[in-house]
Regions:
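Hydrophobic alpha-helix immediately C-terminal to the catalytic Tyr-X-X-X-Lys motif of short-chain
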Residues: 29, 33, 37, 67, ...
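C-terminal substrate-binding subdomain of Rossmann-fold SDR/epimerase-dehydratase oxidoreductases
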Residues: 65, 71-207
Length: 207
């Protein structure tokens, strides 16, 4: 998100940071603050910029856990705009593995993109979730797009690949494992989606 949106190609670490929303700007600020401590105080810092994560224990406001848990409960899946916003998806286990790899082999003060090379539109992700759960696509409900919603994120991860890291999990297998986890752990996410979460959900999606 710190790079902003890109129509074609992929962002490299040296590209300008052009966040489109206060949320992404806060990430950009944290990125640069960490670097400033490296430059000023020689604090051992390595900066990583990762694509969209997914996996077990992800808070259910995020797209994949929200849509999986809604589908399990036969609730509507609120898709922003036309659903064609594209994201690159990175399984959380691979993200953790990449961070551990960079702690050992990364260069202090450097920036590394971490992506899964799994670019899909939000609508594609929605279809995959519904298909894996054998749920009807009639559960999809298109809602007004959110403000500052970037169209496409894409990362060039050549830098970390050249060091020797690449993701181990295929997207389809990782999504299957994630869906299975949420299916088996309603005792964790069920209470989270009650109470204040319902108020947030209604205000966010107007459904």
């Amino acid at each position: 998100e710190v790079y902003g949106s890109i129509e074609s190609g992929s962002f490299r670490e040296e590209d300008n940071l052009l966040p489109s929303s206060p949320y992404s700007a806060s990430k950009c600020g944290g990125d640069r603050l960490a670097y400033s401590y490296f430059k000023t105080y020689d604090l051992p810092v390595i900066i990583t910029r990762a694509s969209n994560n997914f996996g077990a224990f992800q808070y259910p406001e995020k797209l994949i856990p929200l849509f999986v848990t809604n589908a399990i409960d036969n609730l509507k899946l609120p898709v922003y705009g036309n659903g064609l916003n594209v994201r690159d998806w990175l399984y959380v286990d691979d993200h953790c593995d990449a961070i551990n790899f960079l702690i050992k082999k990364g260069k202090l003060g450097e920036v590394y993109n971490i992506g899964g090379n799994n670019e899909f539109s939000n609508l594609d992700i929605t279809y995959r979730i519904l298909d894996q759960l054998n749920k009807s696509r009639k559960l999809i409900e298109f809602v007004d797009d959110r403000k500052g919603h970037d169209l496409r994120y894409s990362l060039d991860c050549s830098k970390i690949h050249e060091l020797g890291w690449s993701p181990k999990n295929s997207f389809d297998n990782a999504l299957k494992k994630s869906i299975q986890w949420y299916f088996q752990n309603k005792s964790w996410w069920g209470p989270i989606k009650s109470g204040d979460f319902k108020k947030y959900y209604k205000n966010q999606y107007k459904i």
